[in-house]
Amino acid sequence: MRSAKLKFEKRKSRIRHKISRTSNRVRLSVFKSGRHIYAQIIDDSKSITIASASTLDKTIKKIKKSHCNVENAIKIGREIAKKANSAGIKEVVFDRGGYKYHGIIKALADAAREKITF
């Protein structure tokens, strides 16, 4: 258990270091818990959140017990891309936050790529 957590933290710090070098673009940050998925577009130079989407939003929320699945990740990816376009953002840096680029994270990224570029 400890080694898995350590690997996660190492991946997270490695990714954040790479992202900090591309400071001219905003970042699309992804977080997932056991039940929900969250996505935010953050401008690190101004320290503000420009747009956000999650499975807690009324447009996505259903009566299911767990909302952390690929189907909802696609909905969140499309929703965050729509909000980014309305805010005038065309390019972002994808911050997967230490998660492996597989499954839910990949589905969210692919859905967001339909309207914004990484």
Swiss-Prot record:
GO terms for molecular function: 5S rRNA binding; structural constituent of ribosome. Keywords: Ribonucleoprotein, Ribosomal protein, RNA-binding, rRNA-binding. GO terms for biological process: translation. It comes from the Bacteria. It holds the Pfam family Ribosomal_L18p. One of its GO terms (cellular component) is cytosolic large ribosomal subunit. The keyword rRNA-binding applies. Belongs to the universal ribosomal protein uL18 family. This is one of the proteins that bind and probably mediate the attachment of the 5S RNA into the large ribosomal subunit, where it forms part of the central protuberance. Part of the 50S ribosomal subunit; part of the 5S rRNA/L5/L18/L25 subcomplex. Contacts the 5S and 23S rRNAs. PANTHER family: 39S RIBOSOMAL PROTEIN L18, MITOCHONDRIAL, LARGE RIBOSOMAL SUBUNIT PROTEIN UL18M. This is Large ribosomal subunit protein uL18. It comes from Rickettsia typhi (strain ATCC VR-144 / Wilmington). The gene is rplR.
